Amino acid sequence: MRKSLLLSSLLFLSISAIANMQKMSSSGEIIAQDSEKWSCVIDNKSSLIWEVKSDKKGVQYAMNTYTWFDGNSGRDNGTFTKNCYWGKNCNTQSFIKDINKAQLCGYSDWRLPSRDELNSIVDYYGDSDLLIDIDFFPNTQMDSYWTAVSVNSNPSMAFEVPFFYGGSMARDKTIDTFVRLVRSAD
């Protein structure tokens, strides 16, 4: 009985999470759940809009990685690598600037998520080893994604969320890591 109740609860939580997500077009319109092309996802439960990664080379290419830099703090004054499609300025500040300039889904206030925000889309009850709903977030890598949060005791590090076990951990800001941007829907 207890086992059935636990399984029912987990299934309800998983279905509830999915019901709260909606796909958005590149212009910011809500589109059908079965659409095969979308650029953002709105999570109605958290009132957050998330960037969706692409399998095509470009600014939102899923394989692009970035060093962490916000223009105010960081390490080596914004050191960047060349692990993004355009091959220059591959740090988080430049990526955010490029996405805001392009007005992804009609908005220009994209940013790195907090630890709690990024953990809110971790799906511990899904059907794959990747801890995210790939029906809404395809092309997500089984790796870590930067948050906006620096480590207080060591400002040369920032927190990241690994989508292979959840939670968060600290990483040196000069190490290339994946990025998924967010904005408030309010």
Report residues per predicted region.
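Glycine-aromatic-enriched surface loops/turns that form tight recognition elements
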Residues: 5, 17-111, 115-186
